[in-house]
A protein has these predicted regions:
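Bacterial N-terminal signal peptides that target proteins for export
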Residues: 2-12
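PPIase-associated folding chaperone regions across multiple families
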Residues: 27-32, 39, 136-213, 257-369
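N-terminal targeting/tethering segments
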Residues: 28-143
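Extended intrinsically disordered, low-complexity coil regions enriched in Ser, Thr, Gly, Ala
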Residues: 114-120, 228, 238, 301, ...
Length: 369
């Protein structure tokens, strides 16, 4: 079984779902055996949809907490499209399930199937899930053993379909398309000063001249050093002012993060060359050195990113085409009974078992797509 499948199984089995003290106070009774999505070959139950929704709920609330955000009332908050966050999340779950159904439906076109070994792993995972969760949790989720087995089967097809669906994607990327240059630069900011009351005040001309003089001092020291191509620019910057520093970065033709004037200056240089004047950018003065016109490591990484982007676009295009032709009905009446609220909260408990380092790492990484 590959790493992705292990992660999916870890999420559903090793991560035991538990109810909070308030669970059950805010949801209508749902019948998990009712059909939620009915397609050409498969029917996904409300219980399965509810399980996927709770997995998403746990992940989102955990992420919000990790980022220091509050979760109280988050599901009732409005999004840009006018729906609540809860409604948007439910819509997303439906799209996830529809996609998995279609991937399974088209699996034979790519000679993809679930092996006996994978079926055995799924059966074992389902058994562990049912044993690990309390009767109260299972009833609240309104899932049956067959629901979890179907979900893990759909996950398996989803995982196995990506490679054959993207096999014909052009993986050739020329250096000219992916080229990344490596530079080192010192930035002396001329942005407005922030006052104690939170307001801002622009720098005076004299203050800006002082900033430019600092940048000039850094440049002069760098050019006067024994080997400007290899000199530590950060050390020189701090010799001028302890608050100054230098940064190493890479950029490509499509870069929009770095200052335009800084990039223009860097592009005129060869390996190891220092731009011989202070660059006046937007709200800053810069000293810049081009370390490598073509950073091989960064360029190869960019090539990989471009190929992955091509594959993802091809994969999504196929899925979208299938969705347009698909006849999948949604049981809106029953799905409406499934809600997200502060009064219906789930937790994800990690198993109290010893694991190998690789397995332990995967348990913490497992995420629901």
């Amino acid at each position: 079984m590959n790493r992705t499948m292990k992660k999916l199984l870890c999420l559903t089995t090793a991560g035991v779902l538990g109810l909070s003290a308030l669970a059950g106070c805010g949801s209508k009774k749902i019948d998990g055996t009712k059909p939620l999505l009915t397609g050409k070959e498969d029917t996904v139950t409300v219980g399965t949809g509810n399980l996927v929704l709770r997995m998403n709920q746990v992940q989102m609330m955990s992420y919000m907490s990790m980022m220091g955000g509050g979760t109280t009332g988050m599901w009732e908050q409005k999004t840009e499209d006018g729906k609540t966050y809860g409604e948007q999340t439910k819509d997303s779950v439906l799209e996830q399930l529809k996609a998995m159904m279609l991937l399974k439906e088209h699996a034979a076109d790519y000679k993809v199937s679930v092996s006996d070994e994978e079926k055995k792993s799924i059966e074992e995972a389902v058994k562990k899930f049912m044993e690990a969760n309390t009767k109260e949790t299972i009833e609240k989720l309104s899932v049956q053993q067959s629901d979890i087995e179907q979900l893990l089967t759909l996950f398996t097809y989803q995982n196995k379909m990506y490679d054959p669906m993207t096999a014909d994607v052009d993986t050739n990327v020329e250096d000219t398309e992916a080229a990344q240059s490596a530079i080192t630069y010192c930035k002396v900011s001329t942005a407005d000063k922030t006052n104690e009351d939170g307001t801002t005040t622009p720098l005076t001309d004299d203050e800006k001249n002082e900033k430019k003089a600092q940048a000039q001092s850094v440049l002069d020291k760098l050019l006067a050093s024994e080997d400007p191509a290899k000199e530590d620019v950060d050390t020189i910057a701090k010799e001028v002012d302890e608050n100054l520093s230098a940064l190493d970065t890479t950029f490509g033709a499509e870069d929009t993060l770095l200052d335009e004037k800084l990039l223009e200056a860097a592009k005129t240089l060869q390996d190891g060359q220092v731009y011989e004047s202070v660059v006046e950018g937007e709200n800053a003065y810069y000293v810049v050195r081009t370390d490598q016109v073509l950073d091989r490591e960064a360029t190869d990484a960019e090539k990989e990113r471009i190929v992955n982007e091509r594959k993802q676009e091809a994969y999504q295009k196929l899925l979208d085409e299938w969705k347009e032709k698909a006849e999948i009905t949604v049981n809106e009446k029953e799905w409406k009974k499934v809600t997200l609220s502060d009064n219906d909260v789930y937790t994800l408990k990690q198993p109290e078992t010893e694991e190998t380092p690789e397995e332990g790492t995967e348990n913490t990484e497992g995420t629901q797509e």
